[in-house]
From Swiss-Prot:
Database matches in SMART domains: IG (SM00409), IGv (SM00406)
Disulfide feature: 23-92
InterPro entries reported in the protein's UniProt record: Ig-like_dom, Ig-like_dom_sf, Ig-like_fold, Ig_sub, Ig_V-set, IgV_Light_Chain
GO cellular component terms attached to this protein's record: immunoglobulin complex
Region called Framework-2, residue ranges: 39-53
Keyword flag Disulfide bond: yes
Framework-3 as annotated region, ranges: 61-92
Name of this protein: Ig kappa chain V-III region ABPC 22/PC 9245
Keywords recorded for this protein, A-Z: Adaptive immunity, Disulfide bond, Immunity, Immunoglobulin
GO BP: any one term: immune response
Domain of life: Eukaryota
Region span, Complementarity-determining-1: 24-38
Alphabetical list of CDD domains matching this protein: IgV_L_kappa
Source organism of the structure: Mus musculus
Length: 111
């Protein structure tokens, strides 16, 4: 199984500043010219919401403050600038190899 390791596990960012979350895969998630890495936001009592697909593509309706980058084994989610509504837990997920796996999550607090 591909193991996804997120860092940090939690972070506190001041309103209007930048938040950066990293995700490292135990092996490459690249195939056919794409990186099969995705980012989700989850708030308590709600299902995960897709933010970024294929490493860097913004899901429809998601603000451009969210961006993703990376390839092979190292990926980053950036939120810039952070807004109060961004307080949530963020997860990376790969679907390059079955079983599809998630990172352990990063809890974002807004100061």
């Amino acid at each position: 199984n591909i193991v996804l390791t997120q860092s940090p596990a939690s972070l506190a960012v001041s309103l209007g500043q930048r938040a950066t979350i990293s995700c490292r895969a135990s092996e490459s998630v690249d195939s056919y010219g794409n990186s099969f890495m995705h980012w989700y936001q989850q708030k308590p009592g709600q299902p995960p919401k897709l933010l970024i697909y294929l490493a860097s593509n913004l899901e429809s309706g998601v603000p451009a403050r969210f961006s993703g980058s990376g390839s092979r084994t190292d990926f980053t989610l950036t939120i810039d600038p952070v807004e109060a509504d961004d307080a949530a837990t963020y997860y990376c997920q790969q679907n390059n190899e079955d079983p599809y796996t998630f990172g352990g999550g990063t809890k974002l607090e807004i100061k």
